[in-house]
């Protein structure tokens, strides 16, 4: 390809794809490069009974373990944070579980509230319109009204709890603990965000 481009995006994971989406209606020529090919959803580990075992081999979160031809080693020996990445179209969203937590106002004031690190130079309210746009774009489903979280209004109703979730919810209620189902980016109705 020798055509000139206005914007080059390296990586079509969550961030790169969001940037490409936000620029799609401009007249700019956008090129998005990805390391790796398309993954077949039928091959995802969650489709088989041995899904847990696959996370220790061909579907490991670390390229150091996975060793696919598209992978490259990452030295994280001196880091308390171990790498989670995937080299394919969609990047690490291939490993993504659709859990969609939003930051809390307190996350922006860690120095003030907890005496560690620095407070952010902006607050939660400044980012609220962008959080809401992102929720609409991604198609977030969730339950509004959590008293311990910011007032969010996901565009779709929540996922059903399921048997395990109901059992855990009952046990947590018995302990008197607060719990709330997490927002997800799994559609619960027809949606075009």
Residue map of PLM features:
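N-terminal glycine-rich phosphate/pyrophosphate-binding loop and immediately adjacent elements
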Residues: 1-112, 116, 121-125, 129-132
């Amino acid at each position: 390809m020798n055509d000139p481009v206005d914007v080059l995006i390296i990586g079509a994971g969550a961030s790169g794809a969001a940037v490409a989406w936000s620029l799609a209606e401009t007249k700019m020529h956008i090129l998005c490069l990805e390391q790796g090919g398309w993954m077949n959803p039928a091959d995802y580990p969650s489709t088989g009974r041995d899904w847990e075992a696959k996370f220790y081999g061909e579907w490991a979160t670390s390229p150091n373990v996975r060793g696919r031809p598209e992978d490259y080693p990452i030295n994280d020996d001196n880091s308390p944070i171990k790498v989670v990445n995937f080299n394919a179209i969609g990047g690490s969203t291939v490993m993504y579980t659709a859990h969609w937590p939003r930051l809390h106002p307190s996350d922006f004031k860690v120095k003030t509230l907890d005496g560690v690190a620095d407070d952010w130079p902006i607050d939660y309210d400044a980012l609220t319109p962008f959080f809401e746009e992102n929720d609409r774009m991604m198609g977030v489903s969730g339950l509004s009204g959590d008293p311990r979280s910011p007032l969010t209004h996901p565009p779709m109703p929540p996922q059903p709890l399921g048997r395990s979730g109901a059992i855990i919810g009952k046990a947590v209620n018995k302990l008197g603990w607060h719990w709330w189902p997490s927002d997800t980016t799994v559609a619960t109705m027809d949606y075009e965000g």
